[in-house]
Amino acid sequence: MLRRRARRVQEEDDPLDAAQERRVRAVLALGGVPQADLPDGVQQVRLRLLERAAKGFEAPRDVSAWAAVVASNLAMDWHRAKKRQERLGERLASLRQHEHPSGEDTSVLSLAVAQGLDELPDQQRQVLVLRFFADLPVRSIAQELGVPEGTVKSRLHTAVRALRARLHEDEVV
């Protein structure tokens, strides 16, 4: 009984609901953060949301979008701190956390996409992950990053073209 009550109180105080936490985890994982560091990344997002409230700032209009952008920024910070090659295997493992029965083709495609993401510039990778993996609309991405919508669209276009070229170059698709 006490555990249920404690859990309920904890859930009420948690600035992120379960769906937002899953989205943050996905953005971090797709941004290259290793599985072992995902809980720390989620805690960082929670902490930043609580710090924002403690400083008297209004809550973000869309907490889910705000949290996804913060998670994306954390992933970019992590990228700057580590060499990309060291974490490629960990990243693929985190993407396969919820494995579906699949063939060798899917594994090859996953590896090629991960390598393609690694080769993109940080800003292009960020908007690509936020748009297609966090499922944020262009307008939300632009607002959260503080850039014009046209800039987001341009980065998306360039990133998709580069990723598509990489996949065709490797004869994956």
Regions found by a protein language model. Name each.
Residues 1-29, 35-42, 50-53:
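A short, charge-rich alpha-helical start-of-domain segment used by transcription regulators
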Residues 20-21, 31, 129-137:
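Short helix-capping/turn signature of helix-turn-helix
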Residues 40-47, 51, 61-73:
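Structural recognition of an alpha-helix C-terminal capping motif at a helix-to-coil junction
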Residues 118, 122, 126, 134-151:
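Helix-turn-helix DNA-binding module
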